[in-house]
């Protein structure tokens, strides 16, 4: 009788622990990420996808690229920075130019071409910077009907007498 009572008591405790575990997500292991105060709860395989940093619908998008670590390349090559013209030279600019800059720096001509915004597929895509031969051009019916004829048959084996067969 005492054995069955202790078995019932142990299964009852296991059930209580499971209920507490399922009701409280922080009952599982707590993993402290770093010194910035993020706390990651890792109590099942899917819980990590509901936490900050694992999905794009959190407040991550409200930060600028300068704030987010690792996006310096995207910030550097963004169209807003490329289009921004350099300031006009000052009348006192020659006083602040060093001899090294005067002798060794190459003056790059300022481009008068400004980029016009084109439709893009994803946020990092910048079709304005693609070379012309990579850009897609729409084919009209005239271009498809009156293009160069493509060969319809190919010869698999062509005999060339200049090639010696040994």
Swiss-Prot record:
Region feature Mn 1, mapped onto this chain: 98-109
Pfam families noted in UniProt: CFAP68 (PF06608)
Location of this chain's protein in the cell: Cytoplasm, Cytoskeleton, Cilium axoneme; Cytoplasm, Cytoskeleton, Flagellum axoneme; Nucleus; Cell projection, Cilium
Segments forming a coiled coil: none
GO biological process: flagellated sperm motility
GO cellular component assignments: axonemal A tubule inner sheath; axoneme; nucleoplasm; sperm flagellum
Keywords per UniProt: Cell projection, Cilium, Cytoplasm, Cytoskeleton, Flagellum, Nucleus
Chief localization: cytoplasm
Chain segments carrying region Mn 2: 139-149
Subunit architecture: Microtubule inner protein component of sperm flagellar doublet microtubules.
Function per UniProt: Microtubule inner protein (MIP) part of the dynein-decorated doublet microtubules (DMTs) in cilia axoneme, which is required for motile cilia beating.
Stated name of the protein: Cilia- and flagella-associated protein 68
């Amino acid at each position: 009788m005492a054995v069955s009572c202790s078995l019932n008591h142990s299964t009852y405790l296991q059930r209580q622990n499971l209920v507490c575990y399922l009701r409280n997500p922080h009952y599982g292991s707590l993993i402290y990420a770093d010194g910035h105060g993020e706390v990651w709860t890792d109590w099942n395989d899917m819980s990590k996808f509901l936490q900050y940093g694992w999905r794009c619908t959190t407040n991550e998008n409200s930060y600028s690229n300068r704030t987010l670590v690792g996006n310096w390349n995207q910030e550097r090559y963004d169209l807003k920075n490329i289009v921004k013209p350099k300031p006009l030279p000052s009348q006192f600019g020659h006083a602040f130019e060093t001899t090294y800059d005067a002798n060794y720096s190459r003056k790059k001509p300022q481009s008068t071409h400004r980029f016009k915004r084109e439709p893009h597929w994803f946020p990092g895509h910048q079709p304005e910077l693609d070379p012309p031969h990579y850009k897609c051009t729409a084919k009209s019916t005239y271009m498809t009907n009156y293009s160069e004829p493509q060969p319809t048959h190919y010869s698999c084996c062509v005999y060339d007498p200049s090639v010696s067969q040994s």
